[in-house]
Amino acid sequence: MFLTRRLLGPFTSAIARKLEHYSQFQPSSLTIQQYLDFGQTGTMKSSFLFLKNELLVRLANIMQEISLLPPTLLKMPSRRLVSNWYCESFEDLLQFEHAQVEPDIMSKFNDQLQTILKRHSRVVETMAEGLIELRESEGVDIASERGIQYFLDRFYINRISIRMLQNQHLVVFGVVLPESPRHIGCIDPGCDVESVVHDAYENARFLCERYYLTAPGMKLEMHNSVNPGMPISIVAVPSHLYHIMFELFKNSMRATVENHGADEDLPPIKVMVVRGAEDLSIKISDRGGGVSRTILDRLFTYMYSTAPPPPRDGTQPPLAGYGYGLPLSRLYARYFHGDMYLVSMEGYGTDAMIFLKAIPVEASEVLPIYSTSSRRQLTMSPQAADWSHQLPNHGNRNL
């Protein structure tokens, strides 16, 4: 109960007990096929009955982990604001815990989901500002940084999963319109991969040209080994794939322009898309000069960025800044059991590799579970060195 009090503060003991209760349950990992099937054959009633419990479980699991963060981070104003949002949302959902399945109740539930989505819209930026506040005020020791990295991977993939549940329900059973008539909620049963790649490239190019007045071109090669000669499509959440590609294109463009100079003929970014029997594989290759192995190990950490922090007044969307682009993109890839990693040759360029499950029944949610193991990871003291020098951790490959 002490951990709960650290998080909830002034909230009632009854709500604290509910938090303890729901954190004892494991979240239900769904496959993208289950999302798709339910979107086609499910009912608003059954979705309501599932969500009103599952959202409480997913919130409670991650809220317990928030309470285990280092005390120096817990007291940062931006971090406290995020916790308040989560506590408010947990309390809002509790009102439906024993609610009757009636049209007006389900309508109010939909309204509440939209309120929660809006409330949490700036969670990523606000948590990032909390880390900046911590760095500027007290600094971060190695042990705390490892715990924060472990937590944030779990926190953000939990956030992705909660928003997926909410958006899927609101598009299928609410008033939110799908992006395309073909979509089942947020899912496209025949996601045109080439189209998503082009959209991400064009938008990243627009941003690059806005900052540098130039941008590298793209050479795209598609290879469908399952249906040779046919366009590549999979069951996917297009917005997730777009997010990954857009962030990687931004990084490649920035590196290419800064390495070669805006006045030179820029080498193109090469993209290879391959549809295999089990995986959709995408490789993005640039000649942006690459990075050393020392830096490569840091690129997926939330406490590191190769660019200065963005302005806090929100006046201009930065091409780079918080340093969250790569770690969040990797989480979007891993959310449905895919992966993403980088291979870099210092002095030449970088390859980004993306793997997504092409078989929807195998594309299952990867969700954090609050447990003894997670508590130990978040609170353990630094270990005594057992090597004379630190070995490369290849952190861009391990979750």
Curated annotation (Swiss-Prot):
Task: Report the superkingdom from the record.
Answer: Eukaryota
Task: Give the protein family.
Answer: Belongs to the PDK/BCKDK protein kinase family.
> Which SMART domains does the entry mention?
HATPase_c (SM00387)
- The record places the transit peptide at 1-18
Q: What is its EC number?
A: 2.7.11.2
Give me the residues that bind ATP, please: 247-254, 286, 305-306, 321-326
One annotated GO molecular function is:
ATP binding
Could you list this entry's UniProt keywords, alphabetically sorted. Answer: ATP-binding, Kinase, Mitochondrion, Nucleotide-binding, Transferase, Transit peptide
InterPro entries the UniProt entry points to: AK/P_DHK_N_sf (IPR036784), BCDHK/PDK_N (IPR018955), BCKD/PDK (IPR039028), HATPase_C_sf (IPR036890), His_kinase_dom (IPR005467)
Reaction(s) catalysed (UniProt annotation): L-seryl-[pyruvate dehydrogenase E1 alpha subunit] + ATP = O-phospho-L-seryl-[pyruvate dehydrogenase E1 alpha subunit] + ADP + H(+)
Q: Does the keyword ATP-binding apply?
A: yes
Name this protein carries in UniProt: [Pyruvate dehydrogenase (acetyl-transferring)] kinase, mitochondrial
Which EC class is the enzyme in?
transferase
GO biological process: what's one of them? regulation of glucose metabolic process
Q: Has the keyword Endoplasmic reticulum been applied to this entry?
A: no
